[in-house]
Amino acid sequence: MGLLSILRKLKSAPDQEVRILLLGLDNAGKTTLLKQLASEDISHITPTQGFNIKSVQSQGFKLNVWDIGGQRKIRPYWRSYFENTDILIYVIDSADRKRFEETGQELTELLEEEKLSCVPVLIFANKQDLLTAAPASEIAEGLNLHTIRDRVWQIQSCSALTGEGVQDGMNWVCKNVNAKKK
């Protein structure tokens, strides 16, 4: 088999499908992040009442991103989406310090869910474009992320609005798709 036929075969190989669950409190920036990933207009975003799904091609993967609303009344339904999740992305509003405790409790509960057991988790410390935003290191310390031992995880500073840090986080996602610990 010649080099050209090998390259053709590689090029025609279908992208590996990856199911990504995008969670976080209401107003954390999940939908803005999703639209940023899909290179869509982010000028008019309304609170997600149910869910949004977008497929994004990245580094040989077809990333199927499920953005689930974060309002308190919707959160009990999050568990309906846990099945077959390959990566969990949890978005935090870094500028809303009054809700750090609440967001920490939600994240802790997610990490204890059996259906999300060992699923790699990327925490986006969003809204870093705001002057009041806490740095990712402060959030990591406040949420005791260093105690996570049953999975690979990463915290990434970002601004879904400007796009800063988003690609770095998605690079981590693509590198860790197959890191689900058994």
From Swiss-Prot:
<dbReference type="Pfam" id="PF00025">
    <property type="entry name" value="Arf"/>
</dbReference>
<feature type="binding site">
    <location>
        <begin position="126"/>
        <end position="129"/>
    </location>
    <ligand>
        <name>GTP</name>
    </ligand>
</feature>
<dbReference type="GO" id="GO:0005794">
    <property type="term" value="C:Golgi apparatus"/>
</dbReference>
<comment type="function">
    <text>Small GTP-binding protein which cycles between an inactive GDP-bound and an active GTP-bound form, and the rate of cycling is regulated by guanine nucleotide exchange factors (GEF) and GTPase-activating proteins (GAP). Required for normal cytokinesis and cilia signaling. Required for targeting proteins to the cilium, including myristoylated NPHP3 and prenylated INPP5E. Targets NPHP3 to the ciliary membrane by releasing myristoylated NPHP3 from UNC119B cargo adapter into the cilium.</text>
</comment>
<dbReference type="GO" id="GO:0019003">
    <property type="term" value="F:GDP binding"/>
</dbReference>
<dbReference type="GO" id="GO:0005929">
    <property type="term" value="C:cilium"/>
</dbReference>
<keyword id="KW-0449">Lipoprotein</keyword>
<keyword id="KW-0206">Cytoskeleton</keyword>
<dbReference type="GO" id="GO:0000281">
    <property type="term" value="P:mitotic cytokinesis"/>
</dbReference>
<dbReference type="GO" id="GO:0007224">
    <property type="term" value="P:smoothened signaling pathway"/>
</dbReference>
<dbReference type="GO" id="GO:0005654">
    <property type="term" value="C:nucleoplasm"/>
</dbReference>
<dbReference type="InterPro" id="IPR005225">
    <property type="entry name" value="Small_GTP-bd"/>
</dbReference>
<keyword id="KW-0131">Cell cycle</keyword>
<dbReference type="GO" id="GO:0005634">
    <property type="term" value="C:nucleus"/>
</dbReference>
<dbReference type="GO" id="GO:0042073">
    <property type="term" value="P:intraciliary transport"/>
</dbReference>
<dbReference type="GO" id="GO:0036064">
    <property type="term" value="C:ciliary basal body"/>
</dbReference>
<dbReference type="GO" id="GO:0032391">
    <property type="term" value="C:photoreceptor connecting cilium"/>
</dbReference>
<keyword id="KW-0472">Membrane</keyword>
<dbReference type="GO" id="GO:0000287">
    <property type="term" value="F:magnesium ion binding"/>
</dbReference>
<feature type="binding site">
    <location>
        <position position="48"/>
    </location>
    <ligand>
        <name>GTP</name>
    </ligand>
</feature>
<dbReference type="GO" id="GO:0035869">
    <property type="term" value="C:ciliary transition zone"/>
</dbReference>
<comment type="similarity">
    <text>Belongs to the small GTPase superfamily. Arf family.</text>
</comment>
<feature type="binding site">
    <location>
        <begin position="159"/>
        <end position="161"/>
    </location>
    <ligand>
        <name>GTP</name>
    </ligand>
</feature>
<dbReference type="GO" id="GO:0007264">
    <property type="term" value="P:small GTPase-mediated signal transduction"/>
</dbReference>
<dbReference type="InterPro" id="IPR027417">
    <property type="entry name" value="P-loop_NTPase"/>
</dbReference>
<protein>
    <recommendedName>
        <fullName>ADP-ribosylation factor-like protein 3</fullName>
    </recommendedName>
</protein>
<dbReference type="GO" id="GO:1903441">
    <property type="term" value="P:protein localization to ciliary membrane"/>
</dbReference>
<keyword id="KW-0547">Nucleotide-binding</keyword>
<keyword id="KW-0479">Metal-binding</keyword>
<keyword id="KW-0539">Nucleus</keyword>
<keyword id="KW-0342">GTP-binding</keyword>
<keyword id="KW-0460">Magnesium</keyword>
<feature type="binding site">
    <location>
        <begin position="24"/>
        <end position="31"/>
    </location>
    <ligand>
        <name>GTP</name>
    </ligand>
</feature>
<keyword id="KW-0653">Protein transport</keyword>
<feature type="binding site">
    <location>
        <position position="31"/>
    </location>
    <ligand>
        <name>Mg(2+)</name>
    </ligand>
</feature>
<dbReference type="GO" id="GO:0001822">
    <property type="term" value="P:kidney development"/>
</dbReference>
<dbReference type="GO" id="GO:0005813">
    <property type="term" value="C:centrosome"/>
</dbReference>
<dbReference type="GO" id="GO:0005525">
    <property type="term" value="F:GTP binding"/>
</dbReference>
<dbReference type="GO" id="GO:0015031">
    <property type="term" value="P:protein transport"/>
</dbReference>
<dbReference type="GO" id="GO:0008017">
    <property type="term" value="F:microtubule binding"/>
</dbReference>
<dbReference type="GO" id="GO:0006892">
    <property type="term" value="P:post-Golgi vesicle-mediated transport"/>
</dbReference>
<keyword id="KW-0597">Phosphoprotein</keyword>
